[in-house]
Regions:
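Short linear sequence motif anchored by a di-proline
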Residues: 1-201
Length: 201
């Protein structure tokens, strides 16, 4: 699961944000709600997201986190996204990358009564990286783009925290992931699992 992440004010993120500001969608979204470009990000926030433009070139667009419906959908399981009606079209051709500095996860524990409880909050990111490239899917609702973050089984280092983690790719595969002609099932095999987790203050 992934329900929070953080954007730090780094040179790389500033470049991504600068690219986003060229999008005509900025004005449309700002008329509804401010775009968040730093700090802790939550579902329903509007944030910078990398995707292909109409010319199939890499671009950055403001998108809102969560598919709307009976309940807000903020995540999609990578194991079933290709077949679930809600996600299968986006899986084929509307893939995106959500740039983050790191994501947050809370320990899921079992108390003495066998009930689940929430433990410590952790900040998690790939080993040796300042930017975390979260894989997502997007769709249009009322002519505006909305996205979900894909999740997968966790790596061994963080299995004690949660039974899911976001699908993360190395930077060199970002352009391939957003390419509508690429095979996402093949790219998933290159997912990053070597991550570090530190307790968040």
């Amino acid at each position: 699961m992934c329900c929070r992440y953080f954007i730090e004010d780094t040179t790389e993120m500033q470049t991504i944000i600068g690219d986003m500001l060229r999008s005509s969608l900025v004005q449309k979204w700002n008329a509804l709600s401010p775009i968040k470009t730093c700090g802790e990000i939550s579902p329903t926030d509007i944030v910078p997201v990398i995707a292909s433009n109409l010319s199939r070139q890499r671009a950055v667009f403001p998108m809102k986190w969560g598919f709307t419906g009976k309940t807000l959908l903020m995540n999609a399981r990578v194991e079933t996204a290709a077949v679930k009606p809600t996600f299968r079209e986006a899986w084929k051709s509307h893939r995106c990358i959500v740039p983050a500095s790191y994501y947050f996860e809370w320990e899921h524990l079992i108390n003495q009564n066998g009930r689940k409880k929430t433990g410590d909050k952790y900040a998690i990111q790939p080993q040796g990286n300042n930017t975390t490239w979260l894989c997502g899917l997007y769709r249009f609702e009322n002519d505006l783009p909305f996205f979900v973050v894909l999740t997968r089984e966790p790596g061994e280092q963080i299995r004690f925290i949660h039974d899911r983690m976001p699908l993360i790719l190395p930077e060199h595969l970002v352009n391939e992931w957003i390419n509508p002609d690429a095979d996402p099932a093949e790219l998933v095999k290159a997912a990053v699992t070597d991550v570090i987790a530190e307790k968040a203050i």
